Amino acid sequence: MTDLTKLPVTVITGFLGSGKTTLIRHLMQNPGGKRLAVIVNEFGDVGVDGDILKSCAIPECPAENILELANGCICCTVADDFIPTIEALMALSPRPEHILIETSGLALPKPLLKAFDWPDIRSRITVDGVIALADAEAVAAGRFAPNIDAVEAQRAADDSLDHETPLSEVFEDQISCADLILLTKPDLAGEDGIARAKDIIA
């Protein structure tokens, strides 16, 4: 990849507990020969997801290529955090060949995707795809998130969050922006639950 080639970015979205970190860990361990970088969007004093991913670092995705945005929901802190983080990854040597972004469970993908049109970065990176993870059992039950209390605690802890969007609307935004939707934990949902979840998403 030359410095003139746009760097592809895959956005991975889904509620807390839907399996985003597990998917990214799998992709890190199976990079297909590409140098990866990862942006983990979380907030609070302890970066649990970031620590988990850094513990899985491999030569194709060393720990210094794993950056955390811990100041709040990525869709609400684009100018202050997201753009500088992208620029920092672009400046790494060797330069990453693909960036994975794990959004917080409350992030609205649409504002984040619009950020890729910012003048500072639009000529250098491109959205390769958006993957939405959905807990099959939670979707089938109409909860959307596997642990509503944990999601609400996450919402309360984020001072930068500038939207009070209901979980159903956040879910709709995640699904409508997705190029690929993965139903996770199918063993907990069972065949009937998976069928209901598919009907709801469709």
Give each language-model segment a name.
Residues E102-S104, L133-A138, A178-R196:
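G-domain G4 guanine-recognition motif of GTPases
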Residues T2-T13, S18, T22-E169:
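Nucleotide-state-sensitive switch-loop elements of NTP-binding domains
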Residues A157-L167, D173, A178, D187-A202:
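C-terminal-of-GTPase-core extension/linker across diverse P-loop GTPases
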